[in-house]
Amino acid sequence: MADPDVLTEVPAALKRLAKYVIRGFYGIEHALALDILIRNPCVKEEDMLELLKFDRKQLRSVLNNLKGDKFIKCRMRVETAADGKTTRHNYYFINYRTLVNVVKYKLDHMRRRIETDERDSTNRASFKCPVCSSTFTDLEANQLFDPMTGTFRCTFCQTEVEEDESAMPKKDARTLLARFNEQIEPIYALLRETEDVNLAYEILEPEPTEIPALKQSKDRAATAAGAAGLAGGHHREAWTTKGPSYEDLYTQNVVINMDDQEDLHRASLEGKSAKERPIWLRESTVQGAYNSEEMKEGGIDIDSFQEHEEGHAGPDDNEEVMRALLIHEKKTPSAPAGSVGAAAPVTAANGSDSESETSESDDDSPPRVATVAAHHGEEDEEDDEFEEVADDPVVMVAGRPFSYSEVSQKPELVAQMTPEEKEAYIAMGQRMFEDLFE
């Protein structure tokens, strides 16, 4: 059962007290903001903006001043919208118990300040030296009086002192406290009337409530927007009924018509002439090393050779190069031993293997073409021979050919080499080492 002395409604005296104080000591903006909080227990900041038509920065400045003076309190609540987005809102309300205590404190502070000013004005110095600016009170007049001249002189510089007009008590200094009590009497009466008022907790800490005026205006706006939407068709949106929702801001409808794009692309291609294919795409660069006469002498049909080359150029571009290398490697073992032995000193003397390889390839070009045409079906065997030659190169020892692996296993063969053969052997080992790590 509730206590009969606890009030569940704010007394009219407390409301009048709040109005008197806010209108007597604050501006019109503060008075308007507090009037809304007097009529409505707890108001959201957005609703106050809607009612007062203030700028948000201006309203917050006013509310912060009132909150700093303990006239109002603020409560922040996190709310979840229909779309799942959480927002924070500030709710303001008046705690009347704190309001009464603040008013009592400020009035008492003002009364003490007036009494202090009145007391200081009666005890201030009344004489001042124009030279050294020393001040003296009425109680020091016996020290200032000079009986020889009958004047008041400064005790420091012996200059005649003057009355300090700025230190003279004001005419209304003694009546200021009386005037203050007379003007603040209505507030004192309201404070005495609300001295023993005990308010319930739901009045001191109210819950947020909806303002009827705003609710009616929103309902009317929603009804008008719905009627306008029906009159204008379904394509018109009722903006007032849609809250701060962001789900429709990024909705985009994109339609892609591929037929139109293909027609435009085809038309653009028809207007442009086809670019000429480069020579390395139209024909093999290796084929240029052979001429038609050499191919005829070797018994090769030029047309069939070209058809064969064109048929193999697409699937594998490296096939022609590999075939030429295989033919070259096959030709090397069939060469006379004398020619091979003569080639080694020349290679060592020139210090370059690329020149000897180039000369051999130039000398063997016609037989190579014939071999290509005659041995299309023996490529596997040639691959095996190429691997054997590549894996085990030939080294000359005293004019006789030996495999590189055999010379490496028998050091006595190295001792039988001539200086030129030894240099060729060392160079071949270096090349094999470099090829191994490339």
UniProtKB/Swiss-Prot annotation:
It comes from Bos taurus (Bovine). Tetramer of two alpha and two beta chains. Interacts with TAF6/TAFII80. Interacts with ATF7IP. Interacts with SND1. Part of TBP-based Pol II pre-initiation complex (PIC), in which Pol II core assembles with general transcription factors and other specific initiation factors including GTF2E1, GTF2E2, GTF2F1, GTF2F2, TCEA1, ERCC2, ERCC3, GTF2H2, GTF2H3, GTF2H4, GTF2H5, GTF2A1, GTF2A2, GTF2B and TBP; this large multi-subunit PIC complex mediates DNA unwinding and targets Pol II core to the transcription start site where the first phosphodiester bond forms. Residues 333-353 have a biased composition (Low complexity). This is General transcription factor IIE subunit 1. Belongs to the TFIIE alpha subunit family. Recruits TFIIH to the initiation complex and stimulates the RNA polymerase II C-terminal domain kinase and DNA-dependent ATPase activities of TFIIH. Both TFIIH and TFIIE are required for promoter clearance by RNA polymerase. Zn(2+) binds at residues 129, 132, 154, 157. InterPro entries: TFE (IPR039997), TFIIE/TFIIEa_HTH (IPR017919), TFIIE_asu (IPR002853), TFIIE_asu_C (IPR021600), TFIIEa/SarR/Rpc3_HTH_dom (IPR024550), Znf_RING/FYVE/PHD (IPR013083), Znf_TFIIB (IPR013137). One of its GO terms (biological process) is transcription initiation at RNA polymerase II promoter. A zinc finger (C4-type) spans 129-157. Residues 330-388 are annotated as: Disordered.
